[in-house]
């Protein structure tokens, strides 16, 4: 893509209000009685809501002082421990025959360090080791059904040390975090980027959570461990399914842990444990997460720009007070037959099929994918309604995932649970009648979790060389894709287009659902958070058959951070059966940095990536 043209368009976009589009639109008609307030009422509103955020300067100042004290304490503890552990290490080393390599000797040291006594020397006073397990090559680790968020444990792991730490965060709360530490040290002094089950690559990767779920995401951590990262993940301070929110009732400290504190503390302590295990600091620190995990990554880089060198976030649920109240509102009118916006669940598939019929060819290719949902409009039955933004609407093409939010007798817990337990502290709050604007204002006033990622000027992260990649599926039926447009545009307004272009890339993914998957046979896999789990617990480390920075977003981020290779395109992949690699590749297509889009060359195979190019519309 021509860079001046891209910057020129960004400059034009920076003068627009919110996420409104200046593109030509067409009228979209939908079967059935869909009136004002429907799930994808696409009217553009132009107001600036009051922002809510958490000032962290004072906290970070105290944290740095605490780090200094903790580090001195850790060194004293380490000196005592090394008297004992050094003798054990020496015993192991002298037993090594002359034919063994120096790497084998280093491996022996790592196996000794997979010991709670050794690792405890690197913990602050409010943290304790809960479990340390040495996992053999091809083994498994996790907590099974005791983990209410993700009970499936990863299998086929590389040799590693699995660690669980419990941290007291307040007199009434605590959180846990886990680590996977690949047991074989790198034989190179430089971090390398090969995907294998071999040595540690010298990098640290933190992974995020989902919904309101509480539990350590071992299954998602395995994606990083198979790429040879040392990996961190937190349980956010509780144990629950992603749709269970009752744990938050009258528990402000637990809500704070979920909002930001558990992940932030896990990164800080996990960094020290990595140093304790390997005898050296990680050379680079990365983050990968989607949905709530996307929000967590944005929140942490805003709070502590030093935490990560590179951040990969998908479908971020960053605007908590607006997104979650939006989920309550849409659930209110879609789930009640007596309301004008009611949509019977059996109509979801009918609507989705007709959207494809009307909108598929807008990009010049009839392939079953709605690639330009922003070009469509669904006129409101009440155009005179008060144009106050609650949250951005779901897009045409997202109908395949509506049942996850709306096929029920009451609003989803993402909305109703949030309002009852985070906002009002009333488990009997009546969802059938409420004032929309007042609910949002109450959420902004009463939700003190600090979860929202609403600090748009992230210059401190950019100034230290940080890189950010954000992606979002156009067919996301849970977190509307245009919410990411909104975040991008507000950051653009706060920082300016030239600075943004140097460190921030946003990729929209036509046809992809929430974080992964598709009902349109659309290319969806870019090696991002959680995507390998579509293939089972013995998942892959990257995009199967395409383990390189052109196809894998995490590897692309590594190349950008460490080698300065700009990410101006990613190639997404899907298979003939979307989650079965053995059925063969069905399609590959380039993803383009927003606001560019992929355009077919008019001649080549539409299923081949090389037949498409990135272009910015006039």
What are the functions of these language-model segments?
Residues 289-293, 297:
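Gly/Ala-rich beta-loop-alpha elbow adjacent to hydrolase catalytic centers
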């Amino acid at each position: 893509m021509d860079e001046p043209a891209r910057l020129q368009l960004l400059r034009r976009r920076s003068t627009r209000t919110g996420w409104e589009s200046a593109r030509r639109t067409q009228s979209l008609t939908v079967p059935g009685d869909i009136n004002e307030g429907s799930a994808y009422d696409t009217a553009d509103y132009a107001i600036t809501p009051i922002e809510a955020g958490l000032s962290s300067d004072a906290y970070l100042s105290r944290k740095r002082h605490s780090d200094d004290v903790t580090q001195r304490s850790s060194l004293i503890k380490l000196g005592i421990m090394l008297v004992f552990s050094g003798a054990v290490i020496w015993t192991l080393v002298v037993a090594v025959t002359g034919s063994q390599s120096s790497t084998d000797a280093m491996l022996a040291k790592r196996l000794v360090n997979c010991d709670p006594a050794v690792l405890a020397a690197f913990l602050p006073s409010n943290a304790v080791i809960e479990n340390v397990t040495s996992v053999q090559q091809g083994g498994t680790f996790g907590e099974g059904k005791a983990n209410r968020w993700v009970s499936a444990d990863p299998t086929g792991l590389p040799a590693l040390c699995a660690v669980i730490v419990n941290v007291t965060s307040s007199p009434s709360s605590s959180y846990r975090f886990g680590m996977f530490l690949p047991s074989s040290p790198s034989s190179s002094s430089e971090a390398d980027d090969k995907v294998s089950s071999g040595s540690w690559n010298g990098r640290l990767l933190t992974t995020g959570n989902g919904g309101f779920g509480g539990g350590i995401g071992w299954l998602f951590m395995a994606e990083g461990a198979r790429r040879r990262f040392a990996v961190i993940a937190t349980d956010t301070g509780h144990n629950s399914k992603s749709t269970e929110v009752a744990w938050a009732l009258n528990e402000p400290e637990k809500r704070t842990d979920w909002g930001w504190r558990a992940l932030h503390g896990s990164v800080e302590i996990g960094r020290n444990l990595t140093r304790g295990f390997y005898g050296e600091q990680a050379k680079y620190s990365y983050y990968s997460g989607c949905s709530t995990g996307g929000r967590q990554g944005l929140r942490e880089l805003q709070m502590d720009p030093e935490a990560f060198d590179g951040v990969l976030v998908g479908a971020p649920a960053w605007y908590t007070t607006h997104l979650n109240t939006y989920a309550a509102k849409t659930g209110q009118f879609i789930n009640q037959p007596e309301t004008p916006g009611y949509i019977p669940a059996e109509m979801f598939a009918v609507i989705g099929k007709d959207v494809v019929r009307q909108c598929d060819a807008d990009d010049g290719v009839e392939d079953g994918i709605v690639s330009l949902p922003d070009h469509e409009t669904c006129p409101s039955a009440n155009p005179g309604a008060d144009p106050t933004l609650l949250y951005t609407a779901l897009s045409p093409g997202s109908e395949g995932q509506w049942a996850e939010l709306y096929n029920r007798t009451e609003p989803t817990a993402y909305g109703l649970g949030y309002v009852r337990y985070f906002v009002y502290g009333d488990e009997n709050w009546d969802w059938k009648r409420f004032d929309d604007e007042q609910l949002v204002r109450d959420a902004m006033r009463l939700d003190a979790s600090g979860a929202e990622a609403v600090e748009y000027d992230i210059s401190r992260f950019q100034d230290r060389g940080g890189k950010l990649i954000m992606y979002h599926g156009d067919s996301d039926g849970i977190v509307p894709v245009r919410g990411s447009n909104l975040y991008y545009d507000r950051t653009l307004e706060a920082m300016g287009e030239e600075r943004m272009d140097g460190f921030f890339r946003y990729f929209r993914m036509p046809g992809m659902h929430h974080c992964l998957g598709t009902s349109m046979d659309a290319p969806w896999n870019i090696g991002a958070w959680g995507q390998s789990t579509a293939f089972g617990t013995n998942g892959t480390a990257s995009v199967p058959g395409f383990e390189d920075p052109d196809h894998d977003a995490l590897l692309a981020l590594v190349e950008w951070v460490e080698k300065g290779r700009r990410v101006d395109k990613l190639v997404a992949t899907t298979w003939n059966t979307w989650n079965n690699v053995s059925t063969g590749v069905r399609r590959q297509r380039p993803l383009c940095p927003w606001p560019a889009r992929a355009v077919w060359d008019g001649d080549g195979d539409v299923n081949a990536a090389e037949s498409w190019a990135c272009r910015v519309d006039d």
